[in-house]
């Protein structure tokens, strides 16, 4: 795990995709070309939060280290420190696993 030199702003989070299994329960090996990108990841960094209509800071529900599920088309893929990551809004996260 590389030390990320990037801090997301407002209600955004940085997520590292969690690698999916390369083999099915029946023992069939899935080639890389047939795999779908996982929709599960680990929060690497989170912004301070968003402001409500009154200007009050509303903190995020997720924090670094949380394992999360997100939509198939959520986030923007970026490369930070040689690592492929996603930047997304907290609202794109469906829930926290565990």
Curated annotation (Swiss-Prot):
Description of how the protein assembles with itself and partners: Heptamer of 7 subunits arranged in a ring. Interacts with the chaperonin GroEL.
PANTHER family (UniProt xref): 10 KDA HEAT SHOCK PROTEIN (PTHR10772), CO-CHAPERONIN GROES (PTHR10772:SF58)
Chief subcellular location: cytoplasm
Subcellular localization(s) per the UniProt record: Cytoplasm
Pfam families: Cpn10
Role played: Together with the chaperonin GroEL, plays an essential role in assisting protein folding. The GroEL-GroES system forms a nano-cage that allows encapsulation of the non-native substrate proteins and provides a physical environment optimized to promote and accelerate protein folding. GroES binds to the apical surface of the GroEL ring, thereby capping the opening of the GroEL channel.
GO biological process terms, semicolon-separated: chaperone cofactor-dependent protein refolding
GO MF term set: ATP binding; metal ion binding; protein folding chaperone; protein-folding chaperone binding; unfolded protein binding
InterPro entries: Chaperonin_GroES (IPR020818), Chaperonin_GroES_sf (IPR037124), GroES-like_sf (IPR011032)
Protein name per the record: Co-chaperonin GroES
SMART domains (UniProt xref): Cpn10
Record-stated family: Belongs to the GroES chaperonin family.
Entry annotated with the keyword Flavoprotein: no
Gene Ontology cellular-component annotations: cytoplasm
Superkingdom as given in the UniProt entry: Bacteria
Alphabetized UniProt keyword annotations: Chaperone, Cytoplasm
Key word Repeat present: no
């Amino acid at each position: 795990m590389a030390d990320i030199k990037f801090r997301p702003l407002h209600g955004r989070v940085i997520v590292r995709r969690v690698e999916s299994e390369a083999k099915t329960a029946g023992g069939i090996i899935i080639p890389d070309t047939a795999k779908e990108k996982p929709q599960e990841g680990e929060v690497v960094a989170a912004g301070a939060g968003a402001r409500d209509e009154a200007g009050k800071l509303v903190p995020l529900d997720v924090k670094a280290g949380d394992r999360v599920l997100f939509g198939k088309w959520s986030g923007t893929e970026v490369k930070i420190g040689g690592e492929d990551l996603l930047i997304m809004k907290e609202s794109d996260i469906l829930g926290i696993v565990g």
